[in-house]
Amino acid sequence: AARKRLFKPIFGCEMYVAPRRLDQMEKEKDGRRYHLIVLAKNETGYHNLVKLVSKSWTDGFYVRPRTDRFELEAHREGLIICSACIAGEVTRKILSGDLEGAEEAVQWYKRVFGDNYYLELQRHEVKDPDQRANRETFPLQQRANARLIELARKYDVKLICTNDCHFVEQED
């Protein structure tokens, strides 16, 4: 049906990445995890995405299903990786003042995924007083975006503008 209508689906997942190995589960070291957008650009990528997601549930579950850098590298073929929201590794490290860690992460993802790695810029200015979380997020995004642009230029990583969307309809 998709081919008849010239509709090309893009399969992907916002995954959680363990700070160390997916089989390590110490609360102090492994309780936090990073967000990462993983998209399949072809059939091989789709199969690798399914492997990553499945293994995150069966072998990496600690509070949430998690993958790690080792699994990402092992199943990198056919995947597009995007740095995600302010809970992504690069952005979180920028916001915590760990600029060396942010640079290391960009270099690692660029080395492993090459031109299939993108840094995400997000700008969610929400003026609705009932939308507290987004209102608090905006200044953080602004601060991170400036540094993300610098990192993209320094390491020749493409930038994309995205939204942290999880629902189609606002009332959902």
Q: Where do the PLM segments sit?
A:
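Phosphodiester-processing cores and adjacent nucleic acid-binding clamps
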Residues: 1-172
